[in-house]
């Protein structure tokens, strides 16, 4: 074996180590193109942790929940909520922050048929989210689409009707059922 071939392995290893050292000192790590950066594209720009009060309204009644150091409680008597209800509230709020509408219909698209066709006049239930005493978002939920995978939603103070993934409304419905004792 010639001297040239004997030095090939150690030279390649030294070059590889040199490249790693260069990457460490330059701070330029190649970004994987397989990973997608998280972007909150939901209808609520506020971070879920900022929401400290939730009001739920439905035909069966109205419920208010407050978040404190010990977790979610009923506003009326301060009783802590069961774990499943707490999870439903937390997940519902997160979904409002991260789940983008599948479709947004402007007023001229739905005005001729009216909101009743989408189950929004009156809405099936409403969730109002607060930061302190300030309402951040009021979401009125209507009927699911014919395939039952999407649901119509309207935000209070806006003219658009949103078509949201059904799991968003289902999580609010779990919280409503728990609040109503069912």
What residues fall within each predicted segment?
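A short-motif feature that recognizes glycine-rich, charge-decorated loops
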Residues: 1-182
């Amino acid at each position: 074996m010639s001297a040239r071939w004997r030095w090939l392995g150690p030279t390649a290893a030294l070059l590889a180590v040199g490249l790693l050292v260069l990457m460490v000192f330059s701070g330029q790590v190649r970004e994987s193109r397989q990973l997608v950066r998280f972007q909150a594209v939901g209808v609520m720009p506020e971070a879920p942790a900022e929401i400290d009060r939730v009001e739920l309204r439905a035909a069966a009644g109205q419920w208010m929940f407050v978040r404190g150091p010990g977790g979610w409680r009923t506003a009326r008597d301060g009783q802590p909520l069961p774990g499943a209800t707490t999870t439903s509230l937390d997940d519902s709020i997160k979904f409002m922050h991260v789940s983008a509408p599948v479709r947004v219909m402007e007023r001229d698209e739905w005005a001729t048929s009216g909101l009743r066709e989408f189950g929004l006049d009156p809405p099936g239930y409403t969730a109002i989210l607060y930061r302190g005493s300030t309402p951040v978002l009021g979401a009125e939920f209507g009927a699911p689409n014919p395939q039952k995978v999407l649901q119509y939603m309207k935000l209070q103070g806006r003219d658009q009707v949103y078509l949201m993934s059904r799991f968003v409304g289902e999580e609010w419905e779990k919280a409503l059922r728990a609040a109503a004792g069912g």
